[in-house]
Design a protein with these regions (language model features):
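Intrinsically disordered, low-complexity, hydrophilic segments
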Residues: 1-78
C-alpha cells in the first residue's frame, strides 16, 4: 500500500489537474487540502467519500478508473 501511496503522491500534480473535471463536486479549496496533506491519497479519498458518499473502496476505484482512462487517452494522443 505504501508503494501505491507514493505513486499517487508522485502523480498528484497530474491527478490534481484533472480532478475537477473527473469529479465535478470538487472545488479548489478541496484540492488545496490535499496539497497540504502528508498522505495525499488518504486525504483525496476522504474528500471523495464526503462529497459523493462513496465507501473508501468505491473512492479508490473511481480514482483508478479515471486515471486509467486518462493514461490511455494520453498514450493515444501521443
Amino acid at each position: 500500500m505504501n508503494n501505491q501511496k507514493s505513486k499517487f503522491d508522485q502523480k498528484w500534480k497530474l491527478i490534481r489537474g484533472q480532478s475537477m473535471e473527473w469529479f465535478s463536486l470538487l472545488a479548489e479549496h478541496d484540492l488545496k487540502k490535499v496539497d497540504k496533506a502528508e498522505d495525499k491519497q488518504d486525504k483525496f479519498v476522504t474528500i471523495l467519500q464526503v462529497k459523493y458518499g462513496y465507501t473508501r473502496q468505491q473512492a479508490a476505484e473511481e480514482i483508478n478508473r479515471h486515471w486509467v482512462a486518462f493514461h490511455r487517452a494520453s498514450k493515444i494522443a501521443a
